[in-house]
């Protein structure tokens, strides 16, 4: 459990079986927001050294489908994962280092942007990615999980295994 989140209760509420790999994946994504899959695998292996890549991929897919984890994939980037879900927030991505930070919705509730024409769709979410050039990750208080941001913040990544 991290930051008061009841991962066991979350899995139960979503109708998912409670397994050690799923709990470890949820914990890894919570502790390393915006982490790439390889980083999630390394973090999970700190708790479960023998877990396979496929098990982590399966857990990420199940948790994303259940709405417990959000998958984001900025253009030109690999998929990233976070546990901050259901609040319609957006992201800012640094063009130079790839760091990602959360940006709260500009106005109102989901969707916080209104399309000029809904073309017959019932729009319930707007996803915005802001692109920027960071002076430094520290200046932007970036909470990214990229190796570059970790190096800039002096935070060690789990070893690459």
UniProtKB/Swiss-Prot annotation:
Entry GO MF terms: DNA-binding transcription factor activity; transcription cis-regulatory region binding; zinc ion binding
GO BP terms, alphabetized: negative regulation of DNA-templated transcription; regulation of secondary metabolite biosynthetic process
An annotated GO cellular component: cytoplasm
Binding-site list for Zn(2+): 94, 97
Record keyword Flavoprotein present: no
Keywords: Cytoplasm, DNA-binding, Iron, Metal-binding, Repressor, Transcription, Transcription regulation, Zinc
Coiled-coil positions: none
Subcellular location: Cytoplasm
Reported function: Acts as a global negative controlling element, employing Fe(2+) as a cofactor to bind the operator of the repressed genes.
Family from the record: Belongs to the Fur family.
Protein name: Ferric uptake regulation protein 1
Species the sequence originates in: Mycolicibacterium fortuitum (Mycobacterium fortuitum)
Gene (name only): fur1
